[in-house]
């Protein structure tokens, strides 16, 4: 009896791309979890392709949930088997993992050491889903660099160095992402006047890993062009990212005009979706916050209402 037959009693088996879309964990990371930590043991076809049971999928989702809480890989197997309450010692070890990543990355940025920064970035993304890396490493790094500049410990050059590094990395990932013929299609852009698009790119990659199709327009996009663009691309929703407060005219007139003229849901993410939640609601748009995983979950609810 081969491994595929041995798992028939578990129900349907799913290929790795299906599991990646269901869980938000890309295939490279799934294979790393299997190889390095033995967290999952998928069946194999005669040609060696991985097949995952529903039990495997549930285990992957549990792993993501634990990682999102900051639990380290050394503790995850125990948590999966026993599900004990998270304790202070476990949390401290987990925080140490991300603290170490961030400290090493800061040193690489201070030294303008692109090779070391690249090694850290690739290692983190080989082990963790991009939304977990974003929350625990990349966004805190951006905050730390801003604080260094504000306190005169750092320089604008450091921020520009890291910003250029991230745009190159994320742009390449967006360009080379695996094409999928199904899934809701999102038109993603930044609010007019918004030139910081790293958060928008991170959101787009995480949404893609969760099975959405992405049409990415980038920074400083006039709202008046979004409806026609969404129609031409046959999108299911318009997603706008905004981290700086938009001009009042945009919230009071342009955004309501966009919602009124659009047959697609208009969704706002980023800091503006928190600070200006009431104005966004009055305009008829949906605010989804700043935490990527929760934003994607909320967006999925909006599109399936």
Label each residue range with its predicted role.
Residues 7-8, 46, 94, 126-127, ...:
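Short leucine-rich amphipathic alpha-helices used at interfaces
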Residues 8-9, 66:
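Short alpha-helical segment immediately N-terminal to, or the first helix within
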Residues 22-178:
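Long amphipathic alpha-helical segments
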Residues 1-7:
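Short helix->loop/beta-hairpin flanking segments within DNA-binding domains
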Residues 17, 31, 63, 204, ...:
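Short glycine-/small-residue-rich flexible loop motifs, especially phosphate/cofactor-binding loops
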Residues 153-305:
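C-terminal regulatory/effector modules of DNA-binding transcriptional regulators
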Residues 9-29:
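Polyanion-binding surface elements
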């Amino acid at each position: 009896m081969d491994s595929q037959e041995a798992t028939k009693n578990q129900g349907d088996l799913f290929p790795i791309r299906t599991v990646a879309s269901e869980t938000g964990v890309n295939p490279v990371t799934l294979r790393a979890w299997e190889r390095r930590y033995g967290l999952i043991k998928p069946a194999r076809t005669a040609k060696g392709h991985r097949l995952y049971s529903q039990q495997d999928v549930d285990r992957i989702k549990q792993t993501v949930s634990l990682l999102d809480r900051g639990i380290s890989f050394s503790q995850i197997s125990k948590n999966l088997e026993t599900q004990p309450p998270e304790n202070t010692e476990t949390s401290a070890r987990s925080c140490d993992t991300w603290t170490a990543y961030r400290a090493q990355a800061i040193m690489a940025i201070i030294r303008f050491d692109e090779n070391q920064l690249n090694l850290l970035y690739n290692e983190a993304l080989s082990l963790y889903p991009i939304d977990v890396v974003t929350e625990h490493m990349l966004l805190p790094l951006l905050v730390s660099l801003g604080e260094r500049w504000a306190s005169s410990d750092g320089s604008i050059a450091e921020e520009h160095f890291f910003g250029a590094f991230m745009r190159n990395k994320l742009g390449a990932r967006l360009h080379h992402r695996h094409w999928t013929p199904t899934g809701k299609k999102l038109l993603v852009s930044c609010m007019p006047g918004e030139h910081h698009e790293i958060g928008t790119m991170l959101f787009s990659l995480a949404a893609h890993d969760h099975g959405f199709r992405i049409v990415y327009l980038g920074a400083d996009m006039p709202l008046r062009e979004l409806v026609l663009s969404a129609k031409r691309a046959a999108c299911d929703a318009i997603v706008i990212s905004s981290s700086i407060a938009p001009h009042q005219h945009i919230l009071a007139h342009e955004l309501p005009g966009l919602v009124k003229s659009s047959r697609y849901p208009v969704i706002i993410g980023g800091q503006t979706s928190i600070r200006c939640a009431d104005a966004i609601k009055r305009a008829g748009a949906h605010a989804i916050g700043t935490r990527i995983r929760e934003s994607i979950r909320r967006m999925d609810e909006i599109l399936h209402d």
